[in-house]
């Protein structure tokens, strides 16, 4: 089928992994000759890349999908695709619920989108959710940014947290080879990208499935080794990585982050709960004390590092005292940013079937109290930037304030200052911070271009 001059639209829900997958699928569609439109109602192909981590994200997908399903009833040539975790979780049930769908595909099939669409355009309704080895993608992604890029280094998850659906929908861990990662990053450097964020569901588990061990018995390939391997790629000025699991986070990794100047001083390490009994019920594989030891080591090597995390309140059986333990941990650590959520039962997870579920009223109250503490702490942490000069990598314009550009500090703080985007995009600028809010900064450029 000739699809040149046809338009596509992708709507992405959920995590950074999904955003990276969407960029790759967009690249595949453009390689087929399609062009992007920001209006889904003008698109010939609409793709929803979905998230099932929480029920509200899943329900939002069905709301969006219903509108396009009605459109397809009068425009049968429209191609409707659901990708990602909801697709993997629901499979053929999605077709029964939304018979207008043409393609249902799990995240392991993102790199096969063109092959699956060939089947669709030949007249088939396709469901692709079987587990398989993730193909190394040779298609150029359509990156949303021209400055910062995602690079997947490990897919899947081998953990079995009692509340989490991710292992069921993203499959087992599959690490890419260091050579493949290095090659992709070299291309990014040649294209002018300045910052790369290495991605993985549990990124510090990277390499456990790759062959080889060192004489001391550790895995031959680790995230630490990979950082050293890619650090000197010319043109890439900044390196980040996410998301880290406390079980695999090592002092050796922290030391590497201190030693390697391109690695930014920002760590995202979810703790989920500050109570040991809840952590055990969650099957997280570490204790409160273990988590605090990690934070202490980070502070020892990199005192000013920014630390962010994920936390869940209202887990089945959580008492008020156990919730207070979570609040106490937050106060003890001093996080720069926390992604917060009330527990949401997910299909096929053990915790969803327990009979000690908390009421929505209790979960909502605890989430509100948690968010108040998070905002207060973020504001307090922001104050340390006042009067300091921070290196800001310019990523774009501040669309709400003409004449301002926006970028991020090495600690991942969104920062605004006056400047011309045509001159500054992709440049690192020293900015003196004059205003600090809970989750962003404003400053004045001391020099318009340093790199």
Curated annotation (Swiss-Prot):
InterPro entries xrefs: Elp3/MiaA/NifB-like_rSAM, Methylthiotransferase, Methylthiotransferase_CS, Methylthiotransferase_N, Methylthiotransferase_N_sf, MiaB_methiolase, rSAM, rSAM_horseshoe
Family, similarity comment: Belongs to the methylthiotransferase family. MiaB subfamily.
Subcellular location: Cytoplasm
PROSITE patterns: MTTASE_N, MTTASE_RADICAL, RADICAL_SAM, TRAM
Cited Gene3D superfamilies: Methylthiotransferase, N-terminal domain, tm_1862 like domain
Enzyme class: transferase
GO terms for MF: 4 iron, 4 sulfur cluster binding; metal ion binding; methylthiotransferase activity
Species: Synechocystis sp. (strain ATCC 27184 / PCC 6803 / Kazusa)
Chain sites annotated for binding [4Fe-4S] cluster 1: 15, 51, 85
Domain MTTase N-terminal: 6-122
All copies of domain TRAM, residue ranges: 383-447
One Pfam family named in its UniProt record: UPF0004
Name this protein carries in UniProt: tRNA-2-methylthio-N(6)-dimethylallyladenosine synthase
Reactions catalysed, as given in the entry: N(6)-dimethylallyladenosine(37) in tRNA + (sulfur carrier)-SH + AH2 + 2 S-adenosyl-L-methionine = 2-methylsulfanyl-N(6)-dimethylallyladenosine(37) in tRNA + (sulfur carrier)-H + 5'-deoxyadenosine + L-methionine + A + S-adenosyl-L-homocysteine + 2 H(+)
Function per UniProt: Catalyzes the methylthiolation of N6-(dimethylallyl)adenosine (i(6)A), leading to the formation of 2-methylthio-N6-(dimethylallyl)adenosine (ms(2)i(6)A) at position 37 in tRNAs that read codons beginning with uridine.
Domain Radical SAM core: 143-384
Record note on cofactor: Binds 2 [4Fe-4S] clusters. One cluster is coordinated with 3 cysteines and an exchangeable S-adenosyl-L-methionine.
Names of the cofactor(s): [4Fe-4S] cluster
Keywords: 4Fe-4S, Cytoplasm, Iron, Iron-sulfur, Metal-binding, S-adenosyl-L-methionine, Transferase, tRNA processing
EC number in record: 2.8.4.3
Subunit (UniProt): Monomer.
GO BP terms in the entry: tRNA methylthiolation
Keyword presence, Iron-sulfur: yes
An example Gene Ontology CC term for this record: cytoplasm
Main localization category: cytoplasm
Residue positions binding [4Fe-4S] cluster 2: 157, 161, 164
